[in-house]
Amino acid sequence: MKSRTVALSILFAALAVVIALISLSVGTTKLPIADVVEVLLGGGRRGTRLVVLELRLPRVATGLLVGIAFGVSGALLQTLSRNPLASPDIVGVNSGASAGAVAVIVLAGTGGGNISGAAAKVGIPLAAVLGGLIATLIVGALSVRRGVVDAGRVVLIGVGVAAAANSLVAWMLVIGDVNDAGRAAAWLAGSLNARAWSDAIPVLIAVVFLLPVAMMFNRDLSALVLGDDVASSLGVRVARIRLGLLVIATVLAAMATAGAGPIAFVALVAPQIAQRLTRMERPPLLTTAMLGALFVVLADLLARNGLQWLRVGPYELPVGVVTAACGAPYLLHLIGRQQKGR
């Protein structure tokens, strides 16, 4: 790993920690950062520990983990397809995962906007992964031309699959109980509000197991950037590696979606910025992971407190609104750059 890549990874990780500490300290009850650090080290007063450990830390931890998962998923998909627009929120993975999760929220709902503990802890993540895998399977199968994945078709077919999945979601919201549908609609905006440890733990498990596995294939990813024929000549088992990494990318995106909803554009923006800053031929996984974590916790800090700081009112925005506001212009920039390159 290049020294520049390592340095940027450390920088983004440090910035993410700083923003996380600030996020833990601000809110209705403002706390000195020193008190927050004391609580995290095992000390602090009982009331402070309650605010930090039970109310705020699950939200911040979920944001960090979701950012890592989305970032790595986007980096893998963009590398495998050799297309900077191939992120899970564009090619249909997030939409498929959302359809699966919403099915559990609406169909397993109690009518009061809540679902049973077992369905929430197990059903939503599993349904999200299943929905994401189905969407990926459809996009992958329809994007192959003459035995090779067509990078242009990936995005076009992905947009179509996403539209179909979003239509299914809309239908479930219409037929579902109004309280369950309202909960699902709020979740679909991409929000870290009221996150609990039960939301963070599944994403943590996915990141802890799958990120190291993905990083084991760094050399294979670099070879795949050169083309399938070159990668095969270098000894890479292209079909097997591509399938395995595609499954990893899908599971990471689906688990992140299950944990916080389909937070837009994190998987698109983080890999591209990391690639530009590191000057590599592809998005580096570790740097992208740290940048994704930084992006989400910073966006959540602004979503939670931005309107109050501007004296607009005591309102909180979904984090997906902030990431979309940042990511949409960058998407247009990427499309414009691709058009100029033709």
Show which residues each predicted segment covers.
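Alpha-helical transmembrane segments in inner-membrane proteins
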Residues: 1-342
